[in-house]
From Swiss-Prot:
It comes from the Eukaryota. Binding to prothrombin and protein C (PROC) is hardly detectable. N-glycosylated; probably required for conformation. Removal of easily accessible sugars does not change its functional capacity, but removal of the core sugars with N-glycanase causes a virtually complete loss of enzyme activity, apparently as a result of major conformational changes in the molecule. Not O-glycosylated. The gene is LC1. Regulatory subunit of the blood coagulation factor X- and IX-activating enzyme. The enzyme activates coagulation factor X (F10) by cleaving the Arg-Ile bond and is also able to activate coagulation factor IX (F9) and protein S (PROS1) by specific cleavage of Arg-Ile and Arg-Val bonds. May serve as an exosite by which the enzyme recognizes and binds to the Gla domain of factor X (F10) and factor IX (F9) in a calcium-dependent manner. Belongs to the snaclec family. This is Snaclec coagulation factor X-activating enzyme light chain 1. It is found in: Secreted. Keywords: Blood coagulation cascade activating toxin, Calcium, Disulfide bond, Glycoprotein, Hemostasis impairing toxin, Metal-binding, Secreted, Signal, Toxin. PANTHER family: MANNOSE, PHOSPHOLIPASE, LECTIN RECEPTOR RELATED. One of its GO terms (molecular function) is metal ion binding. Disulfide bonds join C27-C38, C55-C144, C121-C136. Glycans are attached at N47. It comes from Daboia siamensis. Residues 34-145 form the C-type lectin domain.
Amino acid sequence: MGRFISVSFGCLVVFLSLSGTEAVLDCPSGWLSYEQHCYKGFNDLKNWTDAEKFCTEQKKGSHLVSLHSREEEEFVVNLISENLEYPATWIGLGNMWKDCRMEWSDRGNVKYKALAEESYCLIMITHEKEWKSMTCNFIAPVVCKF
């Protein structure tokens, strides 16, 4: 009886210690996980509109990558450096309604910015770690996130 209580108590301690931790997100094959989101880079060159549409077709809830911290930006820079042929990618930040209000294509709030200048469509240049304005018809690789 004493051994059963000891084993039960040990299991309870382990359960309680793990219950506060975040579960690791199980991303589909080819996608990488970071902070409860999945990311994938594609070497397909697309303009901003086609890139966003492409991402929404990859996986339910997927959009062009949105960046909410310096750490997340570093993760995406590494993903691009290791997986894409070009040192830049579209990001989901743009003036979606042409009313001077910027928002992420996934409708997330803009809390973190590293803008080189204000623009309509933005591209992230990895070696400079800056976001730059680019005509929306420019073609660039794609990083999707869900």
